[in-house]
């Protein structure tokens, strides 16, 4: 598949065909019109992060192992470090971000399976490549660097160490945009893994292995202060461009397919996140439900509270994994907008299923390890601005 790259000048004449230097870039498969694929999903019990390595290894074994997937390969590992720590510092009693121990132990298992390199990927502010910034999230960079394989740390909020962006076309034409420009770290890996949390989301209803990829888009091009020419030193998040559609992306970046479509974030966010999964398919989905939160994605939201499901969910297909994750949260992946947990937005899992990424039919998904009944925990109605205690008090009154 031919890709375009986009340099920091941000003009149309600088949109070039990706050359031979990117021959190893990801080939996005054409999606079949047949039934969306179903793969095995593992659920394992894990009550403590001290057991995470052994339990995740068990989950990998239950889905058929990962050696064939990663041996001799470069693996991209996308984290979920949502929330600027300058405003929202580490909050141990609200474990809504990727846990540092899960990063180290996942890298260890990838190395043990033969991965030659792991690119740890996330977008955050400030948009620099300072390794010290990762420690703000409780990640021991030195420990991760000594897990048995070469490790690169990529803040993909802008160009980073690269000179050009890569243009990735959405295989089915796109829900919101026909293509997106990303940092080249996303194609400088043979395998792409999503390490996410099991939690609610204010707009998307839930956030797991698929929603984790919404942050793939660089704020230099899709942030609120991207301007008409792009901004390699962004300070504003994606709301004006992606969530609300009030601000256009810079010159040279693909425009929306349907500018007359709703400006409602509940319409836009689910479709953009499915586009993101389409342009950079998830080869390995890991959902951390050891400790997490319910009621939303972070402490800027009312009603957020700690949850301890004590599970890890893993598989090769993000839709299948998130479908099982929803069942563990006591939700249905078949639910429509307006029913729990899709209080404010459309169901991204059904949108992904519609374009052939994966199935939301639990009857077609083989579940290894714990059964859903054994793992299930009540996450309540979703992100409604109230804790479970407050909701129960309302029911009694």
Regions found by a protein language model. Give the residues of each.
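N-terminal secretory signal peptides
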Residues: 1-10
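Sec/Tat signal peptide C-region and signal peptidase I cleavage site
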Residues: 31-33
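Sec-dependent signal peptide hydrophobic core
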Residues: 19-23, 193
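Functionally engaged cysteine thiol sites
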Residues: 7, 19, 298
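Extended, low-polarity segments enriched in aliphatic/aromatic residues
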Residues: 35-397
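A short, amphipathic alpha-helical segment
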Residues: 17-20, 330
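Hydrophobic h-region of N-terminal signal peptides that target proteins for export
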Residues: 23-29
């Amino acid at each position: 598949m031919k890709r375009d790259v986009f340099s920091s000048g941000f003009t149309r004449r600088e949109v070039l065909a990706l050359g031979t230097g990117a021959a190893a870039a990801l080939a996005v498969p054409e999606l079949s019109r047949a039934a969306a694929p179903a793969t095995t999903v593992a659920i394992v019990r894990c009550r403590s992060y001290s057991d995470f390595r052994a339990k995740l290894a068990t989950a990998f074994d239950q889905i058929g192992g990962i050696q064939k997937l990663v041996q001799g390969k470069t693996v991209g590992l996308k984290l979920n470090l949502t929330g600027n720590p300058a405003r929202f510092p580490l909050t141990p009693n609200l474990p809504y971000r990727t846990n540092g121990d899960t990063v180290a132990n996942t890298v260890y298992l990838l190395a043990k399976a033969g991965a030659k390199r792991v690119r740890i990927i996330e977008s955050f502010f400030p948009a620099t490549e300072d390794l010290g910034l990762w420690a703000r999230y409780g990640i021991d960079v030195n420990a991760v660097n000594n897990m048995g394989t070469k490790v690169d740390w990529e803040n993909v909020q802008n160009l980073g160490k690269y000179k050009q962006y890569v243009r990735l076309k959405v295989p089915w034409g796109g829900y919101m945009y026909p293509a997106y420009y990303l940092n080249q770290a996303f194609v400088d890996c043979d395998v792409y893994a999503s390490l996410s949390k099991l939690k609610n989301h204010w707009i998307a209803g839930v956030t797991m292995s698929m929603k984790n990829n919404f942050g793939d888009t660089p704020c230099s091009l899709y942030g609120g202060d991207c301007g008409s020419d792009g901004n390699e030193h962004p300070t504003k998040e994606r709301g004006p461009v992606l969530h609300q559609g009030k601000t256009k992306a810079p010159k040279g970046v693909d425009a929306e397919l349907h500018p007359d479509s709703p400006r409602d974030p509940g319409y836009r966010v689910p479709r953009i996140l499915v586009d993101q999964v389409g342009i950079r398919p998830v080869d390995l989905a890991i959902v951390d439900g050891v400790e997490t939160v319910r009621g939303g994605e972070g402490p800027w939201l009312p009603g957020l509270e700690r949850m301890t499901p004590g599970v890890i969910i893993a598989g090769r297909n993000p839709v299948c994994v998130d479908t099982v994750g929803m069942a563990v949260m006591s939700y249905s992946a078949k639910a429509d907008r307006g029913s729990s947990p899709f209080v404010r937005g459309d169901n991204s899992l059904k949108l992904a299923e519609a374009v052939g990424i994966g199935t939301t039919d639990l009857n077609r998904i083989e579940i290894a390890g714990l059964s859903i009944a054994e793992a299930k925990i009540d996450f309540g109605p979703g992100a409604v601005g109230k804790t479970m205690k407050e909701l129960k008090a309302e029911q009694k009154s």
